[in-house]
Amino acid sequence: MNRLPAIFLAMGLVRCAGADNPDDARWDFRFGRPALDGGALAAVWHDGELFVGGAFQGAGANFAPGVARWDGTNWWPVGEGLSATNAIGWTVTSLAVWEHELYAGGNFVRSGDDWLPGLARWNGTNWSALPGIAAARVRRLLVQNGSLFAAGNLQLAGDTNYYGVARWNGNVWETYDSRIGRTEGIGCIAVRGETVYVSGDFNVIADTAIPYNAYWNGATWQLLPGLTNQTFRTLAIHAGGLYGSGSFTHIGGIAANNLARWDGESWWPVGDGFDQAPDRLLSTPSGLYAVGSLKQSGSTTINNVARWNGSAWQSLGADTWPAAENPNELCLADDGRLFAVGYFFSVQGQRAGHAAEWTGTQWKPLVVNNSLALTDGFLSIFSIAADKDSLFVGGVYSEPAGASGRAVWQLKSNVWAKLGGDFTNIGGAPVIASLVVQNGQLFAGGAFTNVNHATIHHLARWDGDQWQPVGNITNGPIGAMVSDGTNLFIGESPAGFQVNGRTVKRWDGHQWSTLADQVNNGITALAWAEGDLYAGGGFTRIGTLAANRIAVWKNGQWETLGGGMDGAAGVTVQAIVVDGTNVFAGGRFATAGGVAVNNLARWDGAQWHPVGSPPTDGVWAPATAIMALTIRDGNLYVGGFFTGAGGQNIPALARFDGTNWTRLGSGLRGWEVATPVPRVRTMAWQENALWVGGLFPAAGNKSAVSLARWVAHPAMRLSVPESMENEAWRIRASGVTGLRFVVESSTDLQEWTECTRGQGDTDPWEFQDASSSSPRFYRTVLCP
């Protein structure tokens, strides 16, 4: 038997190359969508990889706002990406490669903290603004005649005019005197020789009344004839002719279905055209391609993408995209491969994310294989529970294909399963407010009256096959639940539900008993500790006890905790956690026991205190404030709908170590267009990892669709079998689930060399080091 000639060292957490925040290594990489999480509008081939731009923030496992690259296996960010403001619905609309560098145009305004007004250059390391541009909304970039053309609405530095076209030669901008209105813009451009063709929503260009379509003849702007009171969808030069698509059946007096060719004097049809206007035309040495919502060309069925063979249009593939989804941009790689991007969630019936490659016979989605994103559509998580083997989540979903509802799912052995059918509610929107695992049984509570077509009022138990009612109980909507390991406690009716006689009840597995009736407002938080039950909500009376929003059930009766919480309208306690003699309460309130606090307070058994010092530290919120609390190893984790903690910009999720407030890595992010501030509604621990649920697209530098996993204490370990394999040791890393890492080796513990990179798709993870036949040391290094 061979003896092990190596010593294995424990995991070390250090900053990997390019890591802005090394703690982002603790965020699980598996909960992003398999490709892009939003539509793609642009694509270009650069340095052997596909670059895609659009209105997305996640690409595979990574946070990648606006622009991402595909290396053939994985999606990656491009620097800090390109971001818009929360009032803009699209980000990157065009990409081009000029002079060996990547250029992006769109409606973005920044990359990270750097201001970039709509036009940017990527040098392989950083995004930067182009000289001379004061502001820009770029719709199309085009490389022609050794120059870069930008079309849209651009303003040059020191110039008050707005231009529809600008040409960059590397030193200066030439505008062709393309002055247009401030709110107008050019949507497409084509260049042939010195002639520049444009189309857009303008009525005057260079002080000349020319509506929608024009061309620059080298000296002046002229009307491009053919269309009246409408624009072209796209323009392209192919085989010496100008091709234009739009919504027309006639152009320049000739019949043409949504596509025509201009020879400099007249318009001509291009075969039978299409039933819809192509979104983009791509000229290649092998022919002209068209892409869009294309279904017919004369009697020929078209599958969204077609190639012109000189006499007719031929479809690329069949039955590829669902009816309401389609690609809208094409890209040709240097090696002849064709890519399509757009707005589509499936390809050939396979899960996709807005990007695909033509294999020569069919379209193939460009996806990573390790995605555990629950849906490719909308997802908002309201409740989480976990046991040793499974994660349970309850929330609202909307699939791209149209299905939507409220449901509970189980994640076990890296496979999601929907538990039963949807939850519905007569008279209002259903809510799955709380999940609890007790003695191997899963309970779901909230506002619902029906589960999978069976009548169940607000509380259900999963029996392994279907949802069942719990005992003979008539209760109102449930706002909170907790278990002491034997008994299940429920608090009725969150604020907003009109239910008389809200109660706190206990289920012992056989029968119900009431701990409090006539609670005058909703219960939204319950916590159990050391034989005591804590309740929080919007109430001012619980049973016969006057109590402001928080109380404790102790020795068979309710007691107050000081003077409770007060503040402006909507005062409520929504989360409680107990740590020894300290009780932490979070929600929406200004004072606790008369002490000034910001939505978060600590009860020491005698009086209330702010969390942090001074009291203005607290947690600042625009609306709902704190919705979830948990404690581990002396750290208080706070989740909710807030923008800052401890005077710092820390949105939605914060950690307090007793002295300082910090983010978890670089923190959670919001959707810039729809929900700029992320929201956390629920948290739960599973061994050494914290699960976070709510409404957000990313956690740290990872894409994470409303569900994220933070590994608080990575427990990575290296080991080897007892024998060699092919004269080399096979090295095993365990405790790596959801983590990226580097394995390094050394012969002297001074100089370390990277052996390989890995990621925890499987646990344990193994690799073979051909150099391991000689003595050496190994270590693993976490990498964001």
Specify the residue positions occupied by each region the protein language model found:
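Extracytoplasmic surface signature
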Residues: 3-715
